[in-house]
UniProtKB/Swiss-Prot annotation:
Protein name: Small cysteine-rich protein 1
Organism the protein comes from: Acropora millepora (Staghorn coral)
Record note on modification: Contains 4 disulfide bonds.
This protein's UniProt keywords: Cleavage on pair of basic residues, Disulfide bond, Nematocyst, Neurotoxin, Secreted, Signal, Toxin
GO molecular-function terms, A-Z: toxin activity
Primary location group: secreted
Superkingdom, natural source: Eukaryota
UniProt keyword Glycosyltransferase, yes or no: no
Signal peptide positions (record): 1-20
Subcellular location: Secreted; Nematocyst
Something else known: The sequence shown here is derived from an EMBL/GenBank/DDBJ third party annotation (TPA) entry.
Length: 89
């Protein structure tokens, strides 16, 4: 009985220690140096070729805020956006 209890306690402690980094991840998610832009997709905007103008229904270029999967594309948004760390004015 004592061996089973110690083994169970050891496994519980092992799981807690192994998941310690997972618990800290949400703090890192919005750090400006580690932030990755989300995909430029509906409802935010559309990806178009870099040298083309943005369409009339998506007039705002928002490249640093949203990313397109291809490096030859840029993101055109329906309204202007600010990155999460820029703060609202």
């Amino acid at each position: 009985m004592d061996v089973r209890f110690r083994l169970c306690l050891f496994l519980v402690i092992l799981v807690i220690v192994a998941n310690a980094n997972v618990i800290k991840e949400p703090e890192k998610r919005f750090h400006p140096n580690l932030w990755r832009p989300p995909r430029c997709d509906w409802p935010h905007g559309v990806c178009s070729y870099i040298r083309d103008r943005c369409a009339p229904d998506t007039p705002f270029p928002c490249g640093p805020i949203f990313a397109c999967p291809l490096p030859t594309n840029k993101c055109c948004c329906r309204r202007p956006y600010l990155p999460p760390w820029a703060g609202r004015r």
